[in-house]
Amino acid sequence: MRALAAFRAAGGLGLNVTLPFKLQALAAADQASDDARLAGAANALRSEGERIEARNFDGIGLVRDIEVNLGLPLKGQRVLLLGAGGATRGALAPIARAGAARVVIANRTAGKAAALAQEMAPHLAGTVVEGGGF
């Protein structure tokens, strides 16, 4: 995190974070958005005075791309997410907020998908979440 301290000391106010540093970015923050907390990772940090705020825009970007760029509203739809890693964790809450009726997480390791679905379901009111293998 020396790089973050040097960035801030040089006047930096915000930055984007990529793999493999998303988990460390969240840990370095003083506060985090709900999406970052739920995903367990952050892809953006912003200085707020002496504090650092972590955010996760992965899912917000995905939903915007689907709904705005492709013109496909997610409200009431079934969504299939392949993989049960960080990208899926970051996408689940924004997809649920967009009104998806059901999200199926498919992963090579069925147990990992099922565990993620079970962990996240209580946080995604109004959206059924299930996981399995492929």
Each predicted region: which residue ranges?
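Glycine-rich adenosine-cofactor-binding loop
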Residues: 54-59, 66, 70, 75-96, ...
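Phosphate/diphosphate ligand-binding glycine-rich loop within oxidoreductases
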Residues: 1-71
